[in-house]
Structures are given as C-alpha cells and as structure tokens.
Amino acid sequence: MSSARLSTVVLDAHDAHELAGFYVRLLGYEVRADEPDWVLIGPPPGQPGTALAFETEGAYTEPVWPTRRSGDQQMMLHLDIEVDDLDAETARAVAEGARIAEYQPQDDVRVLLDPSGHPFCLWVEATP
C-alpha cells in the first residue's frame, strides 16, 4: 500500500502571480503561500479540490496543442475543470483572461488557454 498522495499541480509561467490570480478568480480558490516567484492556491477550507502552484520561469515557452511539428513546445499536461453551464463558464473564463483554443474536440468540452498559454478544458457531464 502506498502512502503517496497527489497534493499539488505546479504550472510554470512568465509571471506566477498573474497566472495564480487568473485561477483564483476562475476557481474561487484562495492564496495559501505567496513568495516572489512562487504562489500556492487552493480551495477554501472544507471545500474539495487540488491545490495549484505557479512558478515564475524566465525561459518559459507557451505550449502548442495539438502539435505534430518537431521543435514546438508540447503540452505537458492540462487541467480538466467540471462546470454546470459550459457556455456561461466559458464566457466567464474569457472575461478573466482565457482565450478559446482553435482545437475543440467535443460538444461537451471547451478547450481554452490560460493567460500563460496552458491549455485547460471546461466540461459538463454528458447527458444521455
């Protein structure tokens, strides 16, 4: 039996504070730690959710997704965020600074790019 537990997902960015602010607004999270090049956010006490951390990386390069070209910075991961109203939450994410990606694979998923270019998906439970 393993005692390992996933506690935090870390995303690099040109500006950790800017990206953390975006996800605080998008997810309703709170700042838990704030350092010059590192910000940790998480859900309010008693709420479910995985913590996110953001690290300033001077050589950060935005990923290209999907890509088939050699040399492009490929996506290393993306966040899936379940929502109740896909259109309303997509509009809210865009108002907070996200961009809608060209690649849209499914009707019940919206692929967006955060202010640092990381892809993330908003999705709703598909109805039968």
Each model region followed by its residue ranges:
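Conserved Rossmann-like nucleotide-cofactor binding loop
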Residues: 84, 118
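Vicinal oxygen chelate
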Residues: 2-6, 29-78, 90-113, 125-128
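N-terminal first-folded block
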Residues: 18-19, 24-32
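Conserved active-site tyrosine of GNAT-family acetyltransferases
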Residues: 23-24, 93, 117
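Short hydrophobic/aromatic beta-strand micro-patches
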Residues: 10-12, 80-82
